[in-house]
Amino acid sequence: MPNHHTLLSSSLFPVGSNISTWWNFGSMLLTCTALQISTGFFLAVHYTANINLAFSSIIHITRDVPYGWIMQNLHAIGASLFFLCIYIHIARGLYYGLYMNKGVWLSGTTLLIILMATAFFGYVLPWGQMSFWAATVITNLLTAVPYLGNSLTTWLWGGFSINDPTLTRFFALHFILPFLITSLSSIHIILLHNEGSNNPLGTNSDIDKVPIHPYHSYKDMFMISSMITLLFIVLSFMPDLLNDPENFSKANPMTTPQHIKPEWYFLFAYSILRSIPNKLGGTLALLMSVIILTTTPFTHTSYIRPMTFRPLTQALFWTLIATFITITWTATKQVEPPFTLISQVASVTYFSFFIINPIFGWAENKTMMNN
């Protein structure tokens, strides 16, 4: 094997030789983080956090700043790509039982929550019509908190309605949180290196390890290159593919959009929120849709770690994926039959996975013991 740079070699740990492409999404997420922070910095240089100037400053960036349209679209499309990668990353973790490494899984779930908060704050910044109303609807959920709700909402808004102080603090939070994400990502990786990566078979990799470089690093580079290629294809030919047409209009508190909805990556949680006709119940369900991921390390009952050799649980997993897509789709529709019923059934099915999965694990154990 050729000699490599000492610093590079010492920082790259040996891993199992059989890890698949599903293990590449960690490095892709790291690339997305670097891309978002770098493009975000250049956008922040030209952005003005003022309700009268924010929308105009976005137009200024797109039209007047050299390559500003590239920065703005890279940042917007990059956010969608970030969430696509993180959802695949989480699905891989659920399928292969990576949640059994509790420190890594819980730090990852914390990262997801902070990432969702960061993306929400960022969505408000252009001060378009959908940005304003999405912020109004979501921040209003704080009023569902007993006793403290109204005080918390006023504190978050910086007044009695969403106004200039709200935009200023959202910009400050959107700027600072990515650095917290970077720090937590470092902790996430350090915790992972305590035990090392799992593999598709769920077996101990100690007997068959290879250096990350060059074997797995080239695979990482290929997937990162593919991701960046996809990013630039969308940027060049379909830059507004994931934008809401309502957001091309400046925020107007006097006019409500016909259908208020957040970005696609929040639609699953938003659909769960809408499916419950009670404000407090919907808010709790919204929070639980993400927090419930933290329960998986404590409810795993099967003797076998991954789902690779568990056909019953595999069927349950793919039902969860289909449910996730269905919930996302229903959130794009109006709150009317049959979409209300579909989202309610899909929401129950989504949460059922986390209840039925341990039961299936227990049933599989019984079957194995009998055989």
Swiss-Prot record:
Task: Write out the residues that bind heme b b566.
Answer: 89, 188
Please give the cofactor(s) recorded in the UniProt entry for this protein: heme b
The organism named in the record is Toxicocalamus preussi
Q: Does the keyword Heme apply?
A: yes
State how it assembles.
Answer: The cytochrome bc1 complex contains 3 respiratory subunits (MT-CYB, CYC1 and UQCRFS1), 2 core proteins (UQCRC1 and UQCRC2) and probably 6 low-molecular weight proteins.
More details? Heme 1 (or BL or b562) is low-potential and absorbs at about 562 nm, and heme 2 (or BH or b566) is high-potential and absorbs at about 566 nm.
Q: Name one GO biological process term.
A: mitochondrial electron transport, ubiquinol to cytochrome c
Query: Which Gene Ontology cellular component terms are annotated?
Result: mitochondrial inner membrane; respiratory chain complex III
Query: What's a single GO MF annotation on this record?
Result: ubiquinol-cytochrome-c reductase activity
Cofactor comment = Binds 2 heme b groups non-covalently.
Residue positions annotated to bind heme b b562 are: 75, 174
Compartments, as annotated in UniProt? Mitochondrion inner membrane
What gene, per UniProt, encodes this protein? Answer: MT-CYB
Q: What family does the database annotate?
A: Belongs to the cytochrome b family.
Q: How does it sit in the membrane?
A: Multi-pass membrane protein
Residues involved in a ubiquinone binding:
193
Segments spanning the bilayer are 25-45, 69-90, 105-125, 170-190, 218-238, 280-300, 312-332, 339-358
Main localization, broad class: mitochondrion
Q: What does this protein do?
A: Component of the ubiquinol-cytochrome c reductase complex (complex III or cytochrome b-c1 complex) that is part of the mitochondrial respiratory chain. The b-c1 complex mediates electron transfer from ubiquinol to cytochrome c. Contributes to the generation of a proton gradient across the mitochondrial membrane that is then used for ATP synthesis.
InterPro entries (UniProt xref): Cyt_b/b6_C, Cyt_b/b6_C_sf, Cyt_b/b6_N, Cytb/b6-like_sf, Cytochrome_b, Cytochrome_b_C_euk/bac, Cytochrome_b_N_euk/bac, Di-haem_cyt_TM
Q: Please indicate if the UniProt record lists Amino-acid biosynthesis as a keyword.
A: no
* CDD domains linked to this entry: cytochrome_b_C, Cytochrome_b_N
Record-given protein name: Cytochrome b
